Regions:
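N-terminal metal-binding scaffold of metallo-dependent hydrolase/deaminase domains
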Residues: 1-47
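Metal-associated gating/positioning segment near the N- to mid-region
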Residues: 54-124
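Alpha-helix-loop-beta-strand connector modules within alpha/beta enzyme cores
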Residues: 110-127, 177-191
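Divalent metal-coordination and catalytic microenvironments
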Residues: 16, 31, 36, 56, ...
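Histidine/acidic residue-rich metal-binding segments in metalloenzymes
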Residues: 144-331, 347, 352
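Divalent metal-binding segments
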Residues: 69-79, 94-111, 130-145, 161-173, ...
Length: 501
């Protein structure tokens, strides 16, 4: 509830459960905001030009979606920077980190790719943003000259590498080169861990049998491909004594391997995504009760992503366990969608009317639904605490990726917030794609019932989402680029061999 009056602060928020670190501060807490920054947190009333009464709902830091793909050249039917970030404030997200990509294995100029991406993003973002970079050819020019330049001048302190996909796949030796370089620079390494040879081997066998419907995407990328690659990249990380983040983890076995490393104080971090908590491979099948258009035999293509949706609820429960016990460090969307009904989108997988999963662009939409899904199905059901939720969606991404002004509610931090309805205050609803703000013609979570949704989203002290009074208040020029520092999560253990010094 909004009110206006005279006061010393630009905005005051009060009467909510304020989630700060491991604590939940009582509704008697007042937060005073001035110049886009949190200036005071008080147990006594504060006055402001604008007042938000949270009416007993949770007040949390603005969400950080640290794994999104926007305006990528290889996905012409995907979300642009403008359409993708438009969906961030309505879902409680105030900062996203998409990827600038090395254009090809022959391209030695990563700096130009970043500068080009800056041009794409400028005045096209509804929320704040930073950049990761994807490296597909770790030559000396990039590792010794360009990465230091990007870290120092652009504040880019994270690199993603792949063990799969022909365009991006690196050898173990190349991964080691990057890990050693990133250790020296204090850069976070993100790794997509799947065994490419296993995937290629099974894919050939499926093609020989003409098994190419969307469902066979999940068969072609079995859990063992993720399990083996996870063990391998952890071994490489230990050899160089450098932390890594393994992205979009879906396998309980792979997550147990991460847990074992963590229990031995090895700094291995894990990310998972909504699809690995809520969707199974049944959605990929020719006929599925969850499909919106049950008469469309190709609808399963909407759910193609990698790693793929897993086979059973038990496997999803294993990922939930890793969320609950602290194995998972960050919860991201891996928003990488393409329009379904488009010849360059998901329908690219229909060749002369014959489905072929290998030709379907990978990826699902998810920026807007990420935080509401975990809040409704995690916090409100008691599967996780509000504090754990904030760790996963806000504070840990900020720490891991060097967003020093984001991710927590504290004096001096950016005034980024998401405010939820008090439990039971909002009428439940069933999601349809028409309710969302992205540029994609479907959501994998259509048909899911939501019991809560962000009531307000606030970015640097400005209300950018007011669900009850005006909806989206941000514009495409609202977002600002955020230069990042190094990770503040646990780092190297000091065990680097003299060979690599």
């Amino acid at each position: 509830m909004f009110s206006y009056q005279r006061g010393q602060f630009d905005l005051v928020i009060h009467n909510g459960l304020v989630v700060v670190g491991s604590d939940v501060m009582p509704p008697s807490t007042y937060i005073g905001i001035k110049g886009g920054v949190i200036e005071q947190i008080s147990a006594t009333p504060l006055t402001g030009k604008k007042i938000i009464d949270a009416e007993g709902g949770y007040i949390m830091p603005g969400g950080i979606d640290s794994h999104v793909h926007l305006s990528q050249k290889n996905t012409p039917a995907g979300d642009t920077f403008e359409s993708g970030t438009r969906s961030a404030p309505p879902g409680g997200t105030t900062t996203v980190i998409p990827f600038a990509i090395q254009n090809s294995k022959e391209d030695f100029d990563l700096v130009s790719a970043v500068e080009e991406y800056h041009t794409v993003a400028k005045n096209s973002s509804y929320c704040d943003y930073g950049f990761h970079v994807i490296i597909s050819n770790p030559n000396d020019e990039i590792l010794k000259t360009q990465l230091p330049l990007l870290a120092q001048q652009h504040g880019i302190t994270s690199v993603k590498v792949y063990t799969t996909y022909p365009r991006y796949r690196l050898s173990d030796e190349q991964v080691l080169d990057i890990l050693l370089s990133n250790r020296k620079l204090g850069i976070t390494t993100m790794i997509h861990a799947e065994n490419a040879d296993i995937i290629d081997f099974i894919g050939k066998k499926l093609e020989e049998k003409k098994l190419t419907d969307p469902f066979y995407h999940s068969e072609s990328r079995p859990k063992v491909a993720e399990d083996e690659a996870t063990y391998r990249v952890i071994s490489l990380s230990k050899m160089i004594d450098v932390p890594i983040l393994i992205v979009h983890m879906s396998s309980e076995t792979a997550l147990a391997t991460v847990r074992d490393a963590q229990n031995n104080l090895v700094p291995i971090f894990a990310e998972t995504c909504p699809q690995y908590l809520f969707l199974t491979a049944d959605y990929l099948k020719h006929q599925c009760s969850h499909h919106v258009h049950k008469d469309d035999p190709f609808e399963g293509a909407k759910y193609i992503c990698s790693p793929p949706l897993r086979q059973s609820q038990a496997e999803l429960d294993g990922v939930w366990k890793a969320i609950q016990n602290g194995t998972v460090t960050v919860f991201s969307s891996d928003h990488a969608p393409t329009i379904y009904d488009h010849p360059l989108g998901k329908k690219a997988g229909l060749v002369n009317g014959i489905p072929h999963y290998k030709k379907v662009p990978n990826g699902l939409p998810g920026i807007e639904t990420r935080m509401p899904l975990l809040f409704c199905k995690g916090v409100e059901t008691g599967r996780i605490t509000a504090q754990r939720y904030v760790e996963l969606c806000c504070s840990n991404p900020a720490k891991l990726y060097g967003l020093d002004k984001k991710g927590t509610i504290a004096v001096g931090k950016d005034a980024d917030f998401v405010i939820w309805y008090p439990k039971g205050k909002m009428a439940p609803f069933v999601l349809s794609n028409s309710m969302l703000h992205h540029g994609i013609d479907y959501s994998p979570f259509e048909g899911v019932e939501f019991t809560n949704w962000p009531r307000y989203t606030i970015l640097r002290g400005c209300v950018v989402w007011d669900r009850d009074n005006g909806g989206l208040m941000a514009s495409k020029s609202t977002g600002q680029y955020v230069k990042r520092t190094g990770s503040s999560m646990p780092g190297p253990m000091g065990k680097l061999s003299y060979i690599f010094e």
